[in-house]
Regions:
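Helix-to-loop junctions at the C-terminal end of transmembrane segments
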Residues: 79-90, 278-291
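Short amphipathic helix-loop junctions that connect adjacent transmembrane helices
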Residues: 47-62, 247-263
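C-terminal membrane-cytosol helix-exit motif in multi-pass small-molecule transporters
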Residues: 187-205, 395-403
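Conserved MFS/SLC helix-loop-helix module at the cytosolic interface between two early adjacent transmembrane helices
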Residues: 77-113
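Juxtamembrane intracellular "pre-TM" segments in multi-pass secondary transporters
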Residues: 18-24, 201-232
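Cytoplasmic membrane-interface "Motif A"-like loop-to-helix N-cap segments
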Residues: 88-98, 287-300
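Cytoplasmic helix-loop-helix junction between adjacent transmembrane helices
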Residues: 121-158
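Helix-loop-helix hairpin linking two adjacent transmembrane segments in secondary transporters
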Residues: 154-197, 381-382
Length: 473
């Protein structure tokens, strides 16, 4: 993989222990809040628009489904260009610009009376594509030993935000109407910009100057990694099924459970919460026991099982509830593990690009799922769930050959005195098993990102000699 040298500043020393430091906690809180607010803004619309969308001029089932999923097309188009920029320039200004575009799209939707204007507004809102940039910034400000925890926390934040959005959307729409709900999305974007100020700002200097890397080369470096492509397919299938599902569910909840749109939020919340509670220990097992591949594939199989159950029994109350509960277990687990896996497997210098492609796949899935859901609205429900199950099974078959991700650890050392840091860092990086070095001259410390399985007794001794200290590795 590509090795890099980063230079960062932080407010306090970080020791080699199991706890996060203040900067890492602030980063997770701030970036998690940004993600949560943005996901709330995007997804509160999803469980209500299939019903409330009929009040717009020129609305048809297909156009309603398109309005639900079209934000995904904007995301898919702009995630990758914004990620390229974020691998070359500071990440924070790019995030601010994206959130302002998101707010503009929400305002257009709030002022719309025609379904085509809503579609345009949702497309513009989706064009504020900052998901991958936020994830890459999080990777910048967290150490490798806490990266999985941070990424899993972010994934769970996304899952919880979607869960809360599906519960809040019907309730708020009942109070504020659909245009009021769109204004809530505008407010969430503005507040998210404010949260960015509590996130530490890293100063990244890469060994391989990315300005000398063409966009085509960056793209090719990431796309040639088969396992990352399998993760792109997984997130595509996940969000295709989820967006199509929530285009279909409002009508099925009305037909099977006799619930109004406002009441449906009280069903979504406990079901999603149950899936979340069961998913958490699965995620812990994936990392602590190094069973990420097994948990990942089991979660995909669980997703399929939920859809199969819905295809067979969604016309009954028990069948509908059980099928959704099983689906949400798989959904929450996958939502949390995929970002972590991408951060572990992607080349260091192209991490934002890899996350951008993954985010594009995610939102392209949402776009296709929304359009597919609009088409399936006019079909028998058992057929709709069967189609979604078949699509997910096909994805699972392609994903099965995926290999377990690399498991790297971080070590904190004191910088030797009187060294040329550039030359010294290049010597460190030349050692097989050293993947990355992050130096903080103000604190006189550095983090080494290591693959301990590649280190030999000789390279350990050489590393100890270069650092001037005995290393417990």
């Amino acid at each position: 993989s590509v090795k890099s040298t980063s230079v960062k500043s932080t407010s306090r020393n970080i020791s080699h222990n199991s706890s996060m430091n203040a900067s890492e906690k602030k980063a997770i809180a701030g970036l998690g809040g940004i993600f949560a607010l943005r996901m709330l803004g995007l997804f509160m619309i999803v469980p209500v628009f299939a019903v409330y969308g009929t009040q717009y001029a020129h609305a048809t089932p297909f156009l309603i489904g398109l309005a639900i999923g079209i934000y995904g097309l904007g995301q898919a188009i702009f995630q990758i260009p914004m990620s390229f920029l974020a691998d070359k320039y500071p990440r924070k200004p790019i995030i601010i610009a994206g959130l302002l575009v998101f707010a503009l799209g929400g305002a257009i939707c709030a002022l719309s009376t025609d379904i085509y204007m809503v579609i345009l507004g949702r497309l513009i809102a989706g064009s504020g594509a900052v998901s991958a940039v936020v994830m890459a910034l999080l990777a910048d400000v967290t150490r490798e030993e806490h990266r999985t925890k941070a990424m899993a926390t972010m994934g769970l934040t996304i899952a919880m935000s979607v869960m809360v959005a599906f519960g809040l959307g019907p309730i708020l729409t009942h109070v504020l109407d659909i245009s009021g709900l769109f204004w809530v999305t505008v407010a969430s974007a503005i507040f998210a910009i404010g949260l960015l100020w509590i996130v530490p700002t890293p100063n990244r200097v890469l060994k391989h100057n990315l300005n000398n890397h063409s966009v085509k080369a960056q793209f090719a470096d990431v796309l040639k990694i088969a396992d990352i492509n399998r993760l792109h397919l997984a997130i595509f299938a996940l969000h295709l099924s989820m967006t199509a599902m929530f285009t279909l569910l409002p009508h099925q909840f009305h037909d099977v459970l006799g619930l109004t749109v406002a009441q449906q939020g009280f069903v979504y919340l406990p079901l999603l919460l149950l899936g979340f509670i069961i998913a958490v220990p699965l995620i812990i097992i994936a990392e602590k026991k190094r069973q990420m591949r097994a948990v990942f594939l089991a979660s995909l199989a669980t997703l399929v099982a939920g859809l199969v159950f819905l295809a067979l029994a969604s016309q009954t109350i028990v069948g509908l509830i059980v099928g959704l509960a099983v689906y949400y277990i798989g959904f929450n687990s996958l939502e949390a593990t995929i970002p972590s896996w991408i951060s572990k497997r992607a080349p260091v210098a192209n991490k934002a690009t890899a996350m951008g492609i993954n985010s594009s796949a995610q939102f392209l899935g949402a776009f296709v799922g929304g359009a597919m859901g609009g088409i399936l609205l006019t079909k028998p429900m058992w057929l709709s769930w069967t189609v979604l199950a078949i699509v997910t099974v096909i994805a699972l078959l392609f994903i099965l050959p995926i290999a377990a991700p690399p498991y790297l650890t971080s070590l904190t050392i004191t910088l030797p005195t009187g060294i040329d840091t550039t030359a010294w860092s290049q010597q460190i990086l030349a050692i097989d098993g050293v993947d990355e070095i992050v130096m903080m001259p103000k604190e006189n410390i550095a983090y080494l990102k290591l693959d301990k399985e590649k280190l030999t007794d000789d390279t350990r001794q050489h590393l100890s000699h270069l650092t001037g200290q005995t290393l417990a590795i």
